[in-house]
């Protein structure tokens, strides 16, 4: 067995994803999800040695109980896995301006993550809990914990991309600017695209679309991010599962002044009650929207708005490619599986030379990627993302 094993942790506010990955060859020895934290139904499920298992964590369980279960129950079944761990990689949603790349976790790094809590109030506190619990659970790896930031890849954006047209002192004094998200995924699929297209990364011009319950589009020119659709927070940009994406900011004042909604209620509306859920009034699940597009008005409405917004972003980012666009890339749960989203969106972009092959598009689902465009037209690639591998690679590289 390899001695390049890394434990990857992705702590959310009410869940914890985990995996043990060989950082050299990408082999996955363990993967799982603990969820429903602080609720009676808190539970954990995992895959190891080709088998699937699950268990209850106990009412009210959270990150501490989940990590204890991973260490004392799951890994006790395979002590050689635990013995061969060389590092722990932590996904961190927001690193502010301080972090342009992954970093070994020190007191200074922890402070930087804390300083970014206002920009990711649900995610960063959970990451800090996960780091603390990992340090307790794996004391022999205290100096081998690495933070991998979702925002780091976007730190190459030029000023004209990341500044808002607000009073400049809000940026200078309060760091209010665009940061983006999903950077680890955009980084991974762009590097995979370079291999597919047989181009050096530093010459690669692509537009990457990470589409899941959250979604973002990134313009990558000469291998570096030059713009991305998410902003100060992950609320800006595309239509998402429950998030509105771009709106006229004055809608907020109207909701407050004319409809009497308070700030907390407006925040809930924009982040948890909008997007596909708001448009269908039924669900945030894109599968419902796709399955019922031809027969239900709510599904058609949601799909059309979703694809219109996505096509607008792809089209506008094409203008940043300095005359050469190598491909558009789809990834994430929706990007990898929702053939209708890809086809309807690219159908609006014939001006850019996209022409989807219907059969290829249908075939590129459920873990299968490939070029879904017709021969002789601009490539449209489906590339399954692997953020966990990037986190494992960075953790191993920094601690080896």
Swiss-Prot record:
The active site is at 150 (proton donor/acceptor). ATP binds at residues 17, 210-214, 285-287, 333-337. It comes from the Bacteria. Its cofactor is Mg(2+); Mn(2+). It holds the Pfam family Acetate_kinase. SUPFAM superfamilies: Actin-like ATPase domain. GO terms for biological process: acetate metabolic process; acetyl-CoA biosynthetic process. The keyword Isomerase does not apply. Mg(2+) binds at residues 10, 387. Substrate binds at residue 91. Pathway: Metabolic intermediate biosynthesis; acetyl-CoA biosynthesis; acetyl-CoA from acetate: step 1/2. GO terms for molecular function: acetate kinase activity; ATP binding; magnesium ion binding. The record marks 182, 243 as: Transition state stabilizer. GO terms for cellular component: cytosol. InterPro entries: Ac/propionate_kinase, Aliphatic_acid_kin_short-chain, Aliphatic_acid_kinase_CS, ATPase_NBD. Mg(2+). Can also accept Mn(2+). It catalyses: acetate + ATP = acetyl phosphate + ADP. Its EC number is 2.7.2.1. It is an enzyme of class 2 (transferase). Belongs to the acetokinase family. Catalyzes the formation of acetyl phosphate from acetate and ATP. Can also catalyze the reverse reaction. HAMAP family: Acetate_kinase. Homodimer. This is Acetate kinase. The gene is ackA.
